[in-house]
């Protein structure tokens, strides 16, 4: 009744084509609103929801930091435990075991978190672990994150087995320059795609 009496011709509701976090309205409820408010234009409240969710309380900042610190600590532990005979599946199980012990959730699907790639011939993207080990001079890549206190982290790490050749060193320097450029573009009001573009411009 309150909304029907309002003068607003446009009503923002929680649907969004691009942001699933702001897309909470079911299609059925959307249709019901259309029936109840035939003279109103229903528009996405995605921008408003995004801005509100982007504001974090001190407690939320602490929980986000704790999730990131926990993830980084587990990755450090994996690096210390790693041996040349460790397979991708072994590395996944090492992290999963500690997550189960501590009661942490995975930042994305358990079967794919962590994602571990051993060597240059490994499949790319979020893949299931195999029996590959890291050949000398090649990389171990781990993409991993835990959920702790309701907040998720997402961290990637690369380690090299043995000596670092000039090609890997050059790639490392390029990526570091891109990260530095993205970091320099961060600040209040910064838009994600602009930060991303600043980083990619270095590659």
Please annotate each region the language model reported:
Residues 1-203:
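Active-site neighborhoods and metal-handling regions in enzymes and metal-associated proteins
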């Amino acid at each position: 009744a309150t909304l029907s009496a309002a003068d607003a011709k446009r009503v923002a509701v929680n649907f969004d084509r691009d942001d699933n976090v702001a897309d909470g309205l079911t299609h059925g409820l959307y249709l019901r609103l259309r029936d109840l408010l035939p003279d109103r234009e229903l528009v996405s409240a995605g921008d408003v929801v995004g801005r509100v969710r982007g504001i974090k309380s001190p407690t939320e900042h602490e929980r986000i930091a704790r999730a990131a610190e926990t993830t980084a600590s587990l990755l450090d532990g994996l690096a210390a435990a790693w041996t040349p005979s460790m397979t991708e599946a072994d590395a996944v199980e090492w992290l999963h075991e500690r997550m189960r012990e501590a009661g942490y959730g995975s930042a994305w699907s358990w079967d794919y978190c962590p994602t571990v790639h051993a060597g240059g011939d490994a499949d790319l993207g979020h893949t299931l672990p195999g029996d590959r080990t890291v050949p000398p001079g090649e990389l171990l890549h781990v993409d991993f994150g835990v959920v702790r206190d309701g907040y998720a982290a997402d961290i990637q790490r690369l380690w090299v087995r043995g000596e670092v050749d000039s090609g890997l060193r050059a790639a490392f320097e390029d990526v570091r320059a891109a990260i530095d450029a993205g970091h320099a573009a961060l600040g209040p009001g910064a838009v994600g795609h602009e930060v991303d573009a600043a980083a990619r411009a270095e590659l």
